[in-house]
Amino acid sequence: MIYRLKKNFEFTIVYKRGKSFANELLVMYILKNRRNKDRDFLAYSKVGISVSKKVGNSVVRSRCKRLITESFRLNYNYIVKGYDFVFIARNPLQSKSYFEVERAMRSLIKKAGLYNNEEITNTPN
């Protein structure tokens, strides 16, 4: 299950405090998440997706969001948990295939040092 960033303030916190990584298709912001009162880190990651109206009409923007969501979902078990991710689609993304989007996302996550080649399973503490 993918947990989503939904509120505007959640996106704003990641933009202001997080680190950014970019390539031709995507911009990625990451921030280690802290949700509990005692400041423990969550055992899961959350993702938010932003696609500007400059990218295309609503059909194109929805396709971009679906491609990003599916790429994240299929790679979720290889990503280090406990981070908030915000992905921003750039204009060239609208004409790319799923495999190109997945390759771009994976390269950004590897650049951030959050990608493991081995599958990570959630183990309770």
Swiss-Prot record:
Keyword DNA damage (UniProt): no
Native source species: Clostridium beijerinckii (strain ATCC 51743 / NCIMB 8052) (Clostridium acetobutylicum)
Described function: RNaseP catalyzes the removal of the 5'-leader sequence from pre-tRNA to produce the mature 5'-terminus. It can also cleave other RNA substrates such as 4.5S RNA. The protein component plays an auxiliary but essential role in vivo by binding to the 5'-leader sequence and broadening the substrate specificity of the ribozyme.
One annotated GO molecular function: 3'-tRNA processing endoribonuclease activity
Subunit structure: Consists of a catalytic RNA component (M1 or rnpB) and a protein subunit.
SUPFAM superfamilies found in the cross-reference section: Ribosomal protein S5 domain 2-like (SSF54211)
Entry similarity comment: Belongs to the RnpA family.
One matching Pfam family: Ribonuclease_P
Name used for this protein in its record: Ribonuclease P protein component
HAMAP family: RNase_P
Disulfide bridge positions per record: none
The reaction(s) this protein catalyses: Endonucleolytic cleavage of RNA, removing 5'-extranucleotides from tRNA precursor
UniProt-listed GO biological process terms: tRNA 5'-leader removal
Enzyme class: hydrolase
Keyword presence, Nucleus: no
Keywords: Endonuclease, Hydrolase, Nuclease, RNA-binding, tRNA processing
Name of the coding gene: rnpA
GO cellular component terms attached to this protein's record: ribonuclease P complex
Enzyme Commission number, as recorded: 3.1.26.5
